[in-house]
From Swiss-Prot:
It comes from Methanocaldococcus jannaschii (strain ATCC 43067 / DSM 2661 / JAL-1 / JCM 10045 / NBRC 100440). Residues 178-208, 204-233 form the 4Fe-4S ferredoxin-type domain. It comes from the Archaea. GO terms for molecular function: 4 iron, 4 sulfur cluster binding; metal ion binding; oxidoreductase activity. The lineage of its organism: Archaea, Methanobacteriati, Methanobacteriota, Methanomada group, Methanococci. It is a multi-pass membrane protein. This is Uncharacterized protein MJ0750.
Amino acid sequence: MDKIQILRKISQTLFFIYFVFLTSFCLCFFGIIEKFILKGSVGQLIAKLVVIVVLTLILGRVFCGWMCPLGFLFELMYKLRMKLFMKKKLPTVNEEVHNKLIYLRYVVLILSLVLTYYLSIYAFCQVCPIGFLTNLYGTVISLIILIFFLSLSFFVPMAFCRYFCPLGAFLSIFSIKPFFQLKTNNNCVKCKLCEFKCPMQIKITEKLDQKECIRCFECKSSCKKDALSFSYAFKKRS
């Protein structure tokens, strides 16, 4: 394990402990948006939302890959599969199906906001697996959903994050073209080892989709040619 993965694991572990055991603060920033729709104000919580949005504009979806406790658990599940079956390549979803499913989370995002407005309830919070994990809005349904997606992540890496997470959809809007981007350079020999390790099933050697990337840097850590760099967006390709 290289230094960046060690740092990421430390970050994920600390944020997991903080959000799950040390705070009653609503972790899901999507919940803050729902609260704004219902009450017209979120008080000091708006500062937390602004920080995450600004961080995403600068670095991309770093929250998803470094801070989210749910993503941390899903990652543990697919890596457990890799260890048990001694696989080097992550399982993939049919490309045509995958390319359609990635838009499903935007449907979840819009539907959740519409239902929140018209039903005057925290629509997504009622079923959100994070709610159960952090003991905030946990329901039987959210427990079932948590167990389902933990199980699914054993077979489809980061399935919830890829296809269903409204917070991921929200942050994707701000990470279409972040200031710092992950890019391939002229060292790339198209071996696709980076793609074999990408939990989001991104076609890195063809076009690295910044809004889908959760900044886990598994691709960069796996590259033997140092063909991936995380640099300022307007820096010329080397």
